[in-house]
């Protein structure tokens, strides 16, 4: 069976997923596209999915009989509306992060999904599919380094554009770490603090960069995450987990060490698309496979909600300068199956 997929949002990540489904993966076919800029959708169709229908609205796309599953890759503020439309139509939906830009909308999504009686939503937390993170989790789960005490992490981008704002360091960047650390440690957060080191001169005038997020879990594990989105030298993701018996580090992507002119060097990637390309492939293939036969099995709406609650607390901490509590509802049994 080939799964007919409709894609809402044909910007950078949307086009990358359209290419991925059309050229790199199996079992899926792009049958419909929608974007607020119809020319973007037409260009994406011409390049990657020439048979796809361009829909006037996202709702029209979701309603099409040949659209059996939906991918939401539009601007984050639109995600909740489009995910709710897909749930109402009873169609599996892959939603790039964030699931919604606030916890209240995540709750609406969970309520709608539970009312449907089966899982329909997968959230695009692709690091859970990265081989390095999978190996790191296996080491933690088998107790090799003993009980975890703390985590030191880092998320650096070469540079960001003029539309990037200070709070986006949380809602657009840190949100990946907020999810993957919950998953690695199998635990929830209880508090967050954000501090601002000396500001880099490379940041645009309207933003503060870098930032450091300090998190605590229910088990007392302390996590510090440096977010530096104008680091200049490349795209660099690090994670060091310290346990009672040792330390486990997320491996860097493989690169050939080069010795020349009395210098040892190694290439550093400059784009998230290449750093996590294999994880993206695995993530979308998993969605296609599961949606074709039943329900998605990747990161669920609860994961999206948990990340959103933590992100909300971090944004409050940016503004207040205080340690802010992270308070969630009790996990519904629906998401504990």
Curated annotation (Swiss-Prot):
Record EC number: 1.1.1.18
InterPro entries noted in UniProt: Gfo-Idh-MocA_inositol_DH, Gfo/Idh/MocA-like_OxRdtase_C, Gfo/Idh/MocA-like_OxRdtase_N, MI/DCI_dehydrogenase, NAD(P)-bd_dom_sf
Keyword NAD recorded: yes
Keywords, alphabetical: NAD, Oxidoreductase
A Pfam family of this chain: GFO_IDH_MocA
Superkingdom of the organism of origin: Bacteria
Gene Ontology molecular function terms on file: inositol 2-dehydrogenase (NAD+) activity; nucleotide binding
Reaction(s) catalysed by this chain's protein: myo-inositol + NAD(+) = scyllo-inosose + NADH + H(+)
Entry keyword annotation includes Oxidoreductase: yes
Any GO BP annotation: inositol catabolic process
Family label: Belongs to the Gfo/Idh/MocA family.
Function: Involved in the oxidation of myo-inositol (MI) to 2-keto-myo-inositol (2KMI or 2-inosose).
Oligomer status and interactors: Homotetramer.
Name of the molecule in the record: Inositol 2-dehydrogenase
This protein's encoding gene: iolG
């Amino acid at each position: 069976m080939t799964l007919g997929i409709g894609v809402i949002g044909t910007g950078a990540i949307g086009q990358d997923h359209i290419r991925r489904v059309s050229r790199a993966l199996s079992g899926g076919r792009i049958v419909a596209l929608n974007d607020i800029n119809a020319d973007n959708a037409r260009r994406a169709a011409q390049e990657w999915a020439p048979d796809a229908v361009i829909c006037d609205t996202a709702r029209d796309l979701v309603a099409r009989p040949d659209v059996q599953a939906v991918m939401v890759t539009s601007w984050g503020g639109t995600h909740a509306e489009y995910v709710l439309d897909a749930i109402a139509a009873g169609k599996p939906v892959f939603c790039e992060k964030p699931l919604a830009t606030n916890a209240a909308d995540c709750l609406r999504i969970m309520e709608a999904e539970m009312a449907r009686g089966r899982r329909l939503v997968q959230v695009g937390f692709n690091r859970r599919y990265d081989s390095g993170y999978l190996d790191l989790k296996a080491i933690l789960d088998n107790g090799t380094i003993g009980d975890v005490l703390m985590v030191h992490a880092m998320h650096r981008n070469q540079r960001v554009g003029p539309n990037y704002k200070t709070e986006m360091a949380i809602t657009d960047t840190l949100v990946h770490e907020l999810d993957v650390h919950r998953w690695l440690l199998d635990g929830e957060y209880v508090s967050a603090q954000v501090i601002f080191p000396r500001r880099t001169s490379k940041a645009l005038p309207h933003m503060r960069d870098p930032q450091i997020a300090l998190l605590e879990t229910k088990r007392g594990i302390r996590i510090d995450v440096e977010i530096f989105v104008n680091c200049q030298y490349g795209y660099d993701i690090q994670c060091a987990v310290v346990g009672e018996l040792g330390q486990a580090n997320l491996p860097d992507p493989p690169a050939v060490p080069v010795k020349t002119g009395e210098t040892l060097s190694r290439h550093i990637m400059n784009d998230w698309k290449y750093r996590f390309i294999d994880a993206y492939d695995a993530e979308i293939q998993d969605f296609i496979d599961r949606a074709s036969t039943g329900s998605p099995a990747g990161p669920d709406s609860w994961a999206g909600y948990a990340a959103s609650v933590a992100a909300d607390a971090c944004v409050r901490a940016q503004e207040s300068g205080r340690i802010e509590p992270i308070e969630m509802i009790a996990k519904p049994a629906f998401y504990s199956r």
